[in-house]
């Protein structure tokens, strides 16, 4: 049987970090087993579902590179199918119409609580065989088995059992003509041939009800794997402030998608002591059965370390589009400065995020208007104009402008003046960037471009002369 997994977010908000991990695990399980991955949008909550949230989820999936073989499939396009299955259950005596008012249901639950029992529906209409009629309170309820136990072997948590006496006859179709969550997902999984359901353990209480529904409609029951939640660094539930942010905020913060996926994979799964994984390694090694049953903690410092590794080792061409995004976010004209791939080469060893890389690269994409006073005082001393002038002379004469040729010219300038390389490099660094901190001097000058580099050296020579 072909492995088929599904990621089924509700479009009531952005895709947060926990949802991204769920999507990743579902995707990896399918890819590892040579199966298929389905994206399903569970949008039957009409009051809370929004098109903006749908768009945000799709954008995040695309950025993460989690491609799907089928979908997106929208539950709101399948309401007629859900009703068809629900009415067949009624015809088969496995479900029934009920018409209690809100007040009657509240009284029913209050009476149960007064008896110190679990507040739930008491099955009043279960055996009445009421016909379908127009009524604002009309629902369809599933006849949950009255006896026996639901048993399933969770792929992550092991064997779980719950007595049917703990469950009531749940509503499967609401008065508004829409299916409930538990019913819609079961029909979807049946129709879509889902073989493994991997999701957060906040859904674990739904599983016994859903298993009874699968069996009630005559569908094969998929395997279930429930992942523990991700906690913040203090061990508390994630909040927006502590990391439960929109996945796209991680993009804006300058993380590479492959770095984020590598980090997320380790938040609940492991392969020996290995800390870093390429996308292909994850596909080859992942097995949901290897997931941990205990909650993981989000560690932003660790994520930064992982991202730094990927910036240093990933192909330059793969990093460039993400750097361009960051440069454009800063309002920079990318065409007016150095090639982004050259910026990556110059800065990849010096930064932890792409946002930091872009901020350091600003000096090469816009005019230099400010100088660090301490840098000027330290390096624009009398005599610096000689080193700057010699460097300018040799740079202007270069037949080809490359980082290598620039480096040779600067060393030649130092040799010609019989001074240390630092006597040339430091005033030149201030001349080009306005500061005394930058990548190696050959890349710093090269990235400015010949025209801008010579202009900035001329300005610096004037500043030294008038100091």
Curated annotation (Swiss-Prot):
Q: List the protein's name.
A: Glutamate--tRNA ligase
GO cellular component assignments = cytosol
Q: Coordinates of motif 'KMSKS' region in the sequence?
A: 237-241
**High-level lineage:** Bacteria, Pseudomonadati, Pseudomonadota, Gammaproteobacteria, Lysobacterales
Annotated GO molecular function terms are:
ATP binding; glutamate-tRNA ligase activity; tRNA binding; zinc ion binding
Motif segment ('HIGH' region): 9-19
Annotated function: Catalyzes the attachment of glutamate to tRNA(Glu) in a two-step reaction: glutamate is first activated by ATP to form Glu-AMP and then transferred to the acceptor end of tRNA(Glu).
Q: Which residues form a coiled coil?
A: none
